Amino acid sequence: MTLQKAQAERIEKEIRELSRFSAEGPGVTRLTYTPEHAAARETLIAAMKAAALSVREDALGNIIGRREGTDPELPAIAVGSHFDSVRNGGMFDGTAGVVCALEAARVMLENGYVNRHPFEFIAIVEEEGARFSSGMLGGRAIAGLVADRELDSLVDEDGVSVRQAATAFGLKPGELQAAARSAADLRAFIELHIEQGPILEQEQIEIGVVTSIVGVRALRVAVKGRSDHAGTTPMHLRQDALVPAALMVREVNRFVNEIADGTVATVGHLTVAPGGGNQVPGEVDFTLDLRSPHEESLRVLIDRISVMVGEVASQAGVAADVDEFFNLSPVQLAPTMVDAVREAASALQFTHRDISSGAGHDSMFIAQVTDVGMVFVPSRAGRSHVPEEWTDFDDLRKGTEVVLRVMKALDR
């Protein structure tokens, strides 16, 4: 008997079909609890049922397709990703992982695979936070890390809360606690995802073996000088807030390059007030997004930034404050899962390398309740969160084969 393998053509067809469920505009915009979400939900549920999975939704709308095992006492082995998107994003981010999970389920069905553990194939909601500004909400719910009060405090731009939107969508957000999983009922979770960076493609590597997910620190720096007339205020009498702010940005860049361990820093937002072409800048606010797979690197970097900002401001005769408004620690994935992914890629003779994820994923929260492994596949030119996002479908097929092999290894 010839065993069936994952098919790139089926993966492509399903990803393209799901990409149609998008709000108007470039790329894919599929926000949570919208008509576009509803259409994708219907398609995914139908695909799960066609793969002989029993289907249920939890309180927030995570869709769980389940293939029962021969030993009902064993905890489930799960695979999945998210199916929401950023605004005007691409058709692969998250969705590729969901589709490849379903392709794995189809291959198991076609080959008559008999699994001991229950297998679950999960499509997760609201990872991006594009509607409610709270990333990885669905993954946090699976990990039992969403507080009931968040269902009311998290609102969209129209003031609609998660609780209101989920209820209108036909869900029961009041049953939030029942969505939480534990090691007792979840043996492991595997997530296939596009890399969203350039490393695999540049090095011509087929599979990324994710070892860690970066921690994130977000800082807001406020520099306050004095606004004056641009033509009548001598240079030596100015309290221009922009000049020291620019030096601060340059120094942060220097600090990070000195660390040279995968840590990165980005100034993604900067405002200058009053903002007139003939006015000396009186106030400058900018954000710093700091990411690293190493907690110690983040701690040292923040300490250096805080000292530097104070020194630069003092020398320039301006005031400055640093406020940390987001803190997420790095996650080291379970060594047993990292080894399983690495061994699967080797057995399939796919080129592979260890890699740290520079983006956050649901997996980093699910890792708090069970062992987690991640499989990366290449992103063309490293582009993601844009309409031009692209991953070759044959690379997704290879990733699916790795996932299948890992699931079977865990099932032994």
From Swiss-Prot:
Optimum pH is 8.5. One of its GO terms (biological process) is amino acid biosynthetic process. This is N-carbamoyl-L-amino-acid amidohydrolase. Could be used as a biocatalyst for the industrial production of optically pure L-amino acids from racemic 5-substituted hydantoins. Its cofactor is Mn(2+); Ni(2+); Co(2+); Fe(2+). Optimum temperature is 50 degrees Celsius. Its EC number is 3.5.1.87. It catalyses: an N-carbamoyl-L-alpha-amino acid + H2O + 2 H(+) = an L-alpha-amino acid + NH4(+) + CO2; N-carbamoyl-L-tryptophan + H2O + 2 H(+) = L-tryptophan + NH4(+) + CO2; N-carbamoyl-L-tyrosine + H2O + 2 H(+) = L-tyrosine + NH4(+) + CO2; N-carbamoyl-L-phenylalanine + H2O + 2 H(+) = L-phenylalanine + NH4(+) + CO2. Keywords: Amino-acid biosynthesis, Cobalt, Hydrolase, Iron, Manganese, Metal-binding, Nickel. CDD domains: M20_bAS. A divalent metal cation 2 binds at residues 93, 128, 385. Belongs to the peptidase M20 family. The keyword Membrane does not apply. Residues 212-330 are annotated as: Involved in dimerization. Pfam families: Peptidase_M20. One of its GO terms (molecular function) is hydrolase activity, acting on carbon-nitrogen (but not peptide) bonds, in linear amidines. A divalent metal cation 1 binds at residues 82, 93, 193. An N-carbamoyl-L-alpha-amino acid binds at residues 196, 229, 278, 291, 360.
